[in-house]
């Protein structure tokens, strides 16, 4: 904990946990049978049992920041809300919440489709895509001590502009500040599966719509699948499942109509509701982990879940106190009420909704490690059955705790057992524990909804476990940490396509090391990649990592667990780079059929990730390669006359935090020339994100001067030509590119070309970062296995580096460096 002057007030996690425990105990003192600070601290200590999420962890008992304890909010205006005034109001509310440390979600289905008549100077509506960009830009502007805001934008598949929404992020650099998800109803899914037409309309829920449009459901579904395969977005939200299972929607007429989700998708919310998150560390309930005597302690787990639910209810009270402080600060601000009135009214609405429902978000982390510690393999039916038992126990214990609190503290304001009587989740609880249901009818429940499963990425770093219900990413992996732009001392290893900087480091998964110790392996020894692979094969993590788990079984597991989670589950299905779109389609359809409320696909390499696998080639493929006769490598012959057309790869890179593009012309698959320049709508070249290949066409004008054009095909097969590459780019960069193209043309080996580029002594900082981008663009063409002569491994100091898939790999110690 620190203040705005940089003064530090805590020196250890113990200090932080005592701060939290003392505040929880203070709230407990208001109610019967209070927990002591020591009881709470013992569950928090060493992140062993219960772990509050980032906002509660940072904000509880922190008087140095005027901020909310809520992790997530959803906003949205009632009634007709697609006027410019309403759109601007949502934009302002989004920013006001983000500056208080909250992630925000909102739905765009209320915005009129493109071309609709409007009563202003434009005469027709622009549709929802321009407003996606506005909300995205607002998110990126909000500085949260070096972090960006988090935003979820959603739209109903029924909206006539939903196809434009689905395509909005396919152009590189567009809507970079938001996650996007499509709300898909059962009718659309069935029509897509059966290849039948589907009717879109606006307003989407109107009995007398102003706009109707019949489309091919399968064609639009195929686009969703393709875009998810290409760029990991959009995510899909199975909206009928969400509404059907939602307990808060039993009170829809009282303001609890679910309209969107938080940025990660695990909490569907109504407008102006919010949620605080906490997770229970499942690994800590495995007794004798990684041994034949291992078992899960259900009794201890149920006892701790009950306390966790109680703590979460206390945090609702703490949040209401924080909201009062925020509102007092707004009152005291020197601006006029005209300026600050909107923010004050926003927090009034949030306070009202929070006190009405007292929503909580008790979740879990370390599911993957729990399964491994019990000697099971993630993705098997046996492991899924165990997980369902654990989550059923969690749901019953949390709801029993909420019912007990209703008896002691009072039920949430609008509780009505009759409204909930037909809810599928409540009926499952009734069947599993009839006495719990009877008590709930008699006394009510303290919280309108209780459970979720969040990604818990940063939380899992504290617990040193797998995150959420995910399997281990890799037992050994490279991790990226986003760098605070205000921190001048940090080392930057990677800059993504939108200019955010990251530090990279190699990580051994802690629980994998625990397994190694339990099975007699030396954890101090430096292993080669081959040795690590051999060790992993003997462990319960084998064939149970993010990239090689049974993906279909993982989706079915999510659906089975979802039956015992009243909110939703945030899960990403990680896929290798070489999977096809048919698999993505199959996984999405299975997610719908299995009862998942949402699903997100990430194909390795489809966008910049936080963790990067250092994967080996498939063994069968390697064995086939080894069977081939060894042919001496022969340099391609020099071609004196350039063909009129050359195949071309498009490679994007960062130059001093600007988005640049390289066009690499290929002759027989070998780089022949390179053109580089700014990718910009005004001064450079604007290309859709999906364009990765094309042609460079050389034309000679009447004056005898050569001109180079770039041609590509769009998704529908139509060709687009960008004329005059040389005229589009800065002359200084153009001249350096001509120099590099000259040595490529005369077949200097690529690794030597890269050394030449690296040795250029250039004074301008921009040109120096440009040459690094050129090096990266060319490295992918180095033949795998080429030795990096004269270079030493930074880890072991040996001259044993070889190029592999554009990266430098050490044959001696297995260390790797990309970029």
Tell what function each PLM region has.
Residues 793-796, 810-813:
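Short cysteine-rich clusters marking metal-coordination/redox-active sites
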Residues 184, 245, 250-252, 262, ...:
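Terminal amphipathic helices with adjacent charged low-complexity linkers/tails
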Residues 265-267, 319-320, 426, 439-446, ...:
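Catalytic alpha/beta core of large soluble enzyme barrels
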Residues 21-33, 41-120, 128-131, 142-145, ...:
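Function-dense linear segments that define catalytic or interfacial modules
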Residues 1-34, 120-134, 144-256, 287-291, ...:
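Conserved, charged catalytic cores of large soluble enzymes
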Residues 437-439, 615-664:
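Short, Gly/Pro- and small/polar-rich lid/capping loops
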